[in-house]
A protein has these predicted regions:
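A general structural signal for short secondary-structure boundary/capping elements
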Residues: 81, 95-96
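Terminal helix-turn-helix DNA-binding modules in bacterial transcription factors
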Residues: 7, 11, 15-20, 28, ...
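Conserved phosphate-binding and hydrolysis motifs of nucleotide-dependent enzymes
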Residues: 42, 75, 86-87, 91-94
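Extracytoplasmic/periplasmic copper-protein system
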Residues: 3
């Protein structure tokens, strides 16, 4: 069911995932998966995946992992896409976030 889909996404957040794959895990068609998931979680499976990726990215940035590494480890195609998406969701750039929350010395 939907719980299995969530577990799959949490474990494989860095991989490319399709609705067909997720439907297979849940035993539902793409359409029914999308409806059921959104009804239960309040967000789409893709938004859920993005949320997991950004949460992981925040942890890595706090550990001073370079942005390009963070982007690649969290499933983004490149640093540019990661930076734009991070800023849109969090409100600051990854660099600003790392400066604020990372373990850097001033």
């Amino acid at each position: 069911g939907i719980g299995a889909v969530c577990a799959y996404l949490e474990e494989r957040y860095a991989e490319a995932v399709s609705l067909d794959q997720l439907g297979g895990i849940a035993g539902l068609s793409k359409y029914h998966l999308l409806r059921s998931f959104t009804k239960q979680k309040g967000i789409s499976p893709y938004r859920y995946l993005e949320t997991i990726r950004i949460a992981r990215a925040r942890k890595l940035l706090e550990q001073n992992v370079p942005q390009i590494e963070v982007a690649l480890q969290t499933g983004f195609a490149d640093q540019s896409h990661f930076s734009r998406f991070f800023k849109r969701l969090i409100g600051v750039t990854p660099r600003q976030y790392a400066d604020i929350f990372g373990g850097r010395q001033a």
